[in-house]
Structure formats: C-alpha cells, structure tokens
Design a protein with these regions (language model features):
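N-terminal beta1-alpha1-beta2 module of alpha/beta enzyme domains
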Residues: 1-67
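Acidic-and-aromatic substrate-binding clefts and catalytic sites of carbohydrate-active enzymes
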Residues: 46-54, 80-85, 159
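Short mixed-charge
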Residues: 148-154
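Glycine-rich, flexible loop/turn motifs
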Residues: 66, 75, 114-118, 152
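Glycine-enriched alpha-helix->loop->beta-strand junction motifs that scaffold or abut catalytic
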Residues: 66-69, 98
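Short, intrinsically disordered, charge-balanced linker/junction segments flanking boundaries
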Residues: 155-162
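Hydrophobic faces of well-ordered beta-strands that scaffold small-molecule active sites
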Residues: 4-8, 40-42, 72-75, 102-106, ...
C-alpha cells in the first residue's frame, strides 16, 4: 500500500474563523491517525484571511499530543522568516517530546506577500537590546492592528484572526 499523508493549510471557510480552522485541523489529524495515514504536514502562511496556518511548530505539538502513531511535520517552515537556531531548537524540543514522530520540512519562499515578508524579516540583525522598545511597540501594534493610516504594515495582520 502507498503511504498516505495530509498537507494541511488550516483553511478558514466562509463564515468561519481562524480558531475554528485550527480546531478542524486537530480533528482532521486525529481522523488521519485513526485511518492509518503515515504523516501529517502543516504549512506556514502569513497574513492570509483564508489560511490559519501561521505557526506550524505550535500545531505540530498539539497534533502530536492528540495522536498516537502519526508522524507530524512542517511542510514547510519558510527558513528566510526565521533564525535557523530557533527553528533547530523548536524542532529538537518537539522531537524530545515525541521521539521518532517529528519531521522538519523547510522552504525558501516567504509564504506571504512582499509587505508581510518585510514585516517578518525586519530587524533580524543587530544587538540583543538595541531596539527592544521598538520591537515591543511593533508587537503591540501587530496584536492590536494599531498601525496608523499610511503605514506600510497597516494591513499586515497576525494570523489566525480569531
């Protein structure tokens, strides 16, 4: 028999929410595990109202905790959006918690539009505390959608929308 896998973007259906899309993904993974699927992949996309899959490593942990034998992985983590050390550490933690069941798939595409890509990658360089207050303010603005009119990140939204 050919091994079967699922690639899940956690789609947000019309009239639903990102929260429900994530719950649907958890349910689908449990079903895939019961049906004998081999692997469950989670995608990384940002600032898309129709896709709730912005943080695959968090969902990987949730799915691995709710299933018994299914391998769970990222399909994929968009490496340009992350510090490689952080990716390695996150997946090593997942592997320590769920030995032999975690897969790391990586990609090079941004997984988003150019403006959101800029928001994801800005200030990845510099010293640890040079711009802490600026980063804190940016985090608050993203959480509250508080960028002023005309700001390039005005339409960038932390997903999923709940």
């Amino acid at each position: 028999m050919v091994p079967l896998s699922v690639l899940d973007l956690s789609p947000v259906t019309s009239g639903s929410s990102g929260t429900q899309a994530l719950r649907n993904s958890l349910d689908l993974a449990e079903l895939a595990d019961r049906l004998g699927y081999t692997r469950y992949w989670l995608a990384e996309h940002h600032n898309l109202a129709s896709i709730a899959s912005a943080a695959p490593e968090i969902m990987i942990g949730q799915i691995a905790a709710r299933t018994r034998r299914l391998r769970v992985g990222s399909g994929g983590v968009m490496l340009p959006n992350h510090a490689p050390l952080m990716v390695a550490e996150r997946f090593k933690v997942l592997e320590a918690l769920f030995p032999g069941r975690i897969d790391l798939g990586i990609g090079r595409a941004p997984g988003t539009d150019p403006v959101t890509s800029l928001a994801l990658r800005m200030r990845q360089q510099g010293s640890a505390d040079d711009d802490f207050l600026e980063r804190l303010q940016e985090l608050l603005l993203l959480e509250t959608r508080g960028y002023p009119e005309g700001h390039p990140f005005r339409n960038v939204q932390a997903m999923p929308s709940t």
